[in-house]
Amino acid sequence: MSGPRPVRAPRGTELSALGWQQEAALRMLQNNLDPEVAEHPDKLVVYGGTGKAARDWRSFDAMVRTLRTLKQDETMLVQSGRPVGVMQTHEWAPRVLIANSNLVGDWANWEEFRRLEALGLTMYGQMTAGSWIYIGTQGILQGTYETFAAVAAKKFNGTLAGTITLTAGLGGMGGAQPLAVTMNDGVAICIDVDPRAIERRIEHRYLDVKADSLEHALQLAVEARDARRPLSIGLLGNAAELLPRMLAEGAPVDIVTDQTSAHDPLAYLPVGVDFDDMAAYAAKDPAGFTTRARESMARHVEAMVGFMDAGAEVFDYGNSIRGEAQLAGYERAFAFPGFVPAYIRPLFCEGKGPFRWAALSGEASDIAKTDKALLELFPENESLHRWIKMAGERVHFQGLPARICWLGYGERDKAGERFNDMVASGELQAPLAIGRDHLDCGSVASPYRETEAMLDGSDAIADWPLLNAMVNVASGASWVSIHHGGGVGMGRSIHAGQVSVADGTELAGEKIRRVLTNDPGMGVIRHVDAGYDIAESVADERGVRVPMREGDDA
């Protein structure tokens, strides 16, 4: 009988499918549900509150069975975590096409989604949960690290040493925050309502210590700050209660952000509700729970604004908490900016974003070899060298060994081709799955996050992620996905992802060159179209064709 059981991706070179493209999809699906990787694997939940890899266990079993028999000229179709068909295509076509959580506009809200989910008709795919390229907390770590580095450069003379950051949320995404802060030499107080989340981050070496109380957390933080010693501190509690208290007591906080699961009100614990009662209350009275959660978020955001008024650097880290607080009636919810317009958009203009790869061999040595190859490929890229060195020393692998680093247009293709050559030569023990987060330069429409405050006002234009997905299908990606609602919740985002398998063949090399050129190229084009000078310069320098800038009237 199909049901919950431990899942772990196979390692080594023995195939259980008919080719490495299919084998890679199979292993990455299984890896998403590895207990080392997934937050709640028995429920098929990978990260992000309720982000799932498969709709139900019967669907999971059907996908595994189908991938093992899928031919080199066939494509499996996945509709919100359930395999619904196999079509004959061709060897350049993706082996899997995925559409998760997509709803027509007027129906794109949590209430309707949950009604359909209860009927067994859909699932929430988040971003990399339902697209089978989640690699654990490392997947967001460099982006979080770069964000805090940008904060340091903007306000603290290039370092967070001697500063205290206050944040909440230590789940699969938020769990990157403590290590990202300490990598920038700062001190972090990280609040979470779930004791298991705190222990998991300590176990995975993302979080240093757990405080016994708020007073203990502040004592540890001030001592470390005064010594200019990096330290991350986990604190059990509800941010909607603790932040207002800390503000009222004048806590010495320099930076404030948040990564609770505010994108889904049923995943945010209301003030006055015990954590152990949360799931039952949310299931019994979702409307009442949502109202109370939003009221609590309003208190949380009001305190964040209070810290900003007191001089702290405050930003939204893309979980929709400002929008939820506004729905609860808090008028100053958008007084502080999102992290993309504040710090990250110049990188997007260059086609930069979270490039990642996983070693299907299961051998950490394969990642070490790819790290070395990257440093040789890009000897002038100081930030890349700094990141790879720190990641090699401090990042704990979850599931299949993997690495993430931010690379731009003209870099990702070089890295992918080099990796494919390493597989072909036998330098690597098995192929690599090369993908990215959906949070990328040209693959998202999300007015509360990636496309907030676009120069031309095109925040909500959703053509771009659809074009991105189609370009990746046309370019030869191994699997391609289009999702709705990731990161910020239902009705607030459309986004696309791709994974390409470096199996050492000449065909894989051709596909990789096209995909890893065109995928980040969409980011350059999207930002040229929005009027960003940096993107125009990148397009001119690197030969990205933009028809509206060609011809006599360009």
Curated annotation (Swiss-Prot):
It comes from Streptomyces avermitilis (strain ATCC 31267 / DSM 46492 / JCM 5070 / NBRC 14893 / NCIMB 12804 / NRRL 8165 / MA-4680). The gene is hutU. Catalyzes the conversion of urocanate to 4-imidazolone-5-propionate. Its EC number is 4.2.1.49. The active site is at residue 405. Its cofactor is NAD(+). Its main location: cytoplasm. It is found in: Cytoplasm. It catalyses: 4-imidazolone-5-propanoate = trans-urocanate + H2O. Keywords: Cytoplasm, Histidine metabolism, Lyase, NAD. InterPro entries: Urocanase (IPR055351), Urocanase-like (IPR023637), Urocanase_C (IPR035401), Urocanase_central_sf (IPR038364), Urocanase_CS (IPR023636), Urocanase_N (IPR035400), Urocanase_Rossmann-like (IPR035085), Urocanase_sf (IPR036190). NAD(+) binds at residues 48-49, 126, 172-174, 192, 238-239, 259-263, 268-269, 317, 487. Belongs to the urocanase family. Binds 1 NAD(+) per subunit. One of its GO terms (biological process) is L-histidine catabolic process to glutamate and formamide. One of its GO terms (cellular component) is cytoplasm. The keyword Oxidoreductase does not apply. Pathway: Amino-acid degradation; L-histidine degradation into L-glutamate; N-formimidoyl-L-glutamate from L-histidine: step 2/3. This is Urocanate hydratase. GO terms for molecular function: urocanate hydratase activity.
